[in-house]
Amino acid sequence: MKLTCVLIAAVLPLAVCQFDSTDASAYMRKNPSLRSPKRTRDCKTKGSVCFASSECCIQDCWFVCLY
């Protein structure tokens, strides 16, 4: 009985993660502009202030776009 509970507890988070990634994949298919990690539309260039690397055209960010 304990083994069954342990297995269920171990598999449940994996199943939840799988559902989340499936939803994300479907969302990416619906919106093709999100597929490419190097989107050039609305991206910031070198020296621009950034909070995440995805904001920069080349995706390197350390408070400012590095490339």
Swiss-Prot record:
GO annotation, cellular component aspect: extracellular region
Principal place of residence: secreted
InterPro entries assigned to the protein according to its UniProt record, in alphabetical order: Conotoxin
Expression across tissues: Expressed by the venom duct.
Manganese is among the record's keywords: no
One of the Pfam families matching this protein, by short name: Conotoxin
Cleaved propeptide residues: 25-37
Keywords, ordered alphabetically: Disulfide bond, Knottin, Neurotoxin, Secreted, Signal, Toxin
Family (UniProt): Belongs to the conotoxin O1 superfamily.
The protein, known as: Conotoxin Cl6.9
